[in-house]
């Protein structure tokens, strides 16, 4: 890795819902759905050169004839063959690079099982022949992207949410909490709400429409009960949405009922604590001396934290739980949808980081377990 200066590292953030990839120092140039689609019916169209699998946007656009699968569930890779297809697509089709020429920085969910980190490492070196790689925890990268090294990150993506307290750049594993409630559950719950109103959304293709409704129209109420009253008495919060077939639907209270689930998981029958309480519980698992630093640096990250109103509501709820004199600051960076990727891009560009990479030589000598020694 002597001539590492002129070789741009690749940064690939594999989320449950979206892959974000690109070159360190740039913006994420490839953002596409983490899906692999396979034809439901084999070879209906002779001579069409039908592929046995489609990845990302192509799978998305042909979703009508495919069965769609997400290889990452709740933030953790569950199907390695499909995951390999996604990485192959990322390098060769999206970024159009030869992976054997670039160091690769991958991201992982907090508390990712050890065997999974080893498998990622193995695939990178043995299948893609990368010269060097590194695995970084997603929340830590988000915190770097916000210009901090200490704070607590509430990460909520499509498949999973975590609260991750970080002190001087190191995640504190004993205080990390996982909540299996995230964007996909909110989409599902909105599908149910709309179905109760007589709009049928059932297939995986229709789920994507509902996801779009959620992303465009949903918001978090500062006071849920009061917002419900407002919704009953006036039509001020109603908005129209045009479906692909031209039908127009009106959504009102659903706009804030949908993300309210983050604060009240019992609304969809989950026994878990809401994101505000989980954040508080995470802080309380930390040493009393660092809590003040955590309360003052609560950083939101991931697509499911993009709802308007979420930061104010978080601030209100945590203020109610915390000691009364505590200064509470919730930070919602505008680019938080991509902050994991941005943090990876920053990290991989640092001159001080260059000795952190796991090289091919080290891998050949030690095997996949090297990842636990070098990435923590």
Curated annotation (Swiss-Prot):
Superkingdom assignment: Eukaryota
PROSITE patterns for this protein: ACTINS_1, ACTINS_2, ACTINS_ACT_LIKE
Compartments where found: Cytoplasm, Cytoskeleton
InterPro entries: Actin, Actin/actin-like_CS, Actin_CS, ATPase_NBD
Primary localisation category: cytoplasm
Catalysed reaction equations from the record: ATP + H2O = ADP + phosphate + H(+)
Entry GO CC: cytoplasm; cytoskeleton
Tagged with keyword Nucleus: no
One example GO MF annotation: hydrolase activity
The EC number(s) this enzyme carries: 3.6.4.-
CDD domains named among the record's database cross-references: ASKHA_NBD_actin (cd10224)
Keywords, comma-separated and alphabetical: ATP-binding, Cytoplasm, Cytoskeleton, Hydrolase, Nucleotide-binding
Record flagged with keyword Nucleotide-binding: yes
Role this protein plays: Actins are highly conserved proteins that are involved in various types of cell motility and are ubiquitously expressed in all eukaryotic cells.
PANTHER family: ACTIN (PTHR11937)
Family of this protein: Belongs to the actin family.
Protein name: Actin-2
Species of the source: Pisum sativum (Garden pea)
């Amino acid at each position: 890795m002597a001539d590492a200066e002129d070789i741009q590292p690749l940064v690939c953030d594999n989320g449950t819902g979206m892959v974000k990839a690109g070159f360190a120092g740039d913006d994420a140039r490839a953002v596409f759905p983490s899906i692999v689609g396979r034809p439901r019916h084999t070879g209906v169209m002779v001579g069409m050169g039908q592929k046995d699998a489609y990845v990302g946007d192509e799978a998305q656009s042909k979703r009508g004839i495919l069965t769609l699968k997400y290889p990452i569930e709740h933030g953790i890779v569950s199907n390695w063959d499909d995951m390999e297809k996604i990485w192959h697509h990322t390098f060769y089709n999206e970024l159009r690079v030869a992976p054997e020429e670039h160091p690769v920085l991958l991201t992982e969910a907090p508390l990712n099982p050890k065997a999974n980190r080893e498998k990622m490492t193995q695939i990178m070196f043995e299948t893609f022949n990368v010269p060097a790689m590194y695995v970084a925890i997603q929340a830590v990268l988000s915190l770097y992207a916000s210009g901090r090294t200490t704070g607590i990150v509430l990460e909520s993506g499509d498949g999973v949410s975590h609260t991750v307290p970080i002190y001087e750049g190191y995640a504190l594993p004993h205080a990390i909490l996982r909540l299996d409630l995230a964007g996909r559950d909110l989409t599902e719950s909105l599908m149910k709400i709309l179905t109760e109103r007589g709009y049928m959304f059932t297939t995986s293709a229709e789920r994507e429409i509902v996801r779009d409704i959620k992303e465009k129209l949903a918001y978090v109420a500062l006071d849920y009960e009061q917002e419900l009253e407002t919704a009953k008495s006036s039509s001020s919060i109603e908005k129209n949405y045009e479906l692909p077939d031209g039908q127009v639907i009106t959504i009102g209270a659903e706009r804030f009922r949908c993300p309210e689930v983050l604060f009240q998981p019992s609304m969809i029958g989950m026994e878990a604590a809401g994101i505000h309480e989980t954040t508080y519980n995470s802080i309380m698992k930390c040493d009393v001396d660092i809590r003040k630093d955590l309360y003052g640096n609560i950083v939101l990250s991931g697509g499911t934290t993009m709802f308007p109103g979420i930061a104010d509501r978080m601030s209100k709820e945590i203020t109610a739980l915390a000691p009364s004199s505590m200064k509470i600051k919730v930070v919602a960076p505008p680019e938080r949808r991509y902050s994991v990727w941005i943090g990876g891009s920053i990290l991989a560009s640092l001159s001080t980081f260059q000795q952190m990479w796991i090289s091919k030589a080290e891998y050949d000598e030690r095997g996949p377990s090297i990842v636990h020694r070098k990435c923590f």
